[in-house]
From Swiss-Prot:
Zinc keyword on record: no
The organism's taxonomic lineage, starting at the top: Bacteria, Pseudomonadati, Pseudomonadota, Acidithiobacillia, Acidithiobacillales
EC number: 1.12.2.1
Protein name: Cytochrome c3 hydrogenase small chain
Keyword Ribosomal protein: no
Catalyses which reaction(s): 2 Fe(III)-[cytochrome c3] + H2 = 2 Fe(II)-[cytochrome c3] + 2 H(+)
Top EC class for this record: oxidoreductase
């Protein structure tokens, strides 16, 4: 699955919340579920 993450000018903290997740971690999501993250 592909995930496109668009970051605008707002500082809502969504990116940091995603990266700091404990269970499942961002690394676990990418490796275990085969997710392709495309960040902008």
């Amino acid at each position: 699955a592909n995930v496109l993450w668009l970051q605008g000018g707002a500082x809502s903290g969504n990116t940091m919340s995603f990266l700091n997740a404990e269970e499942p971690s961002a690394x676990d999501l990418v490796t275990d579920f085969g997710i392709n993250v495309l960040x902008q």
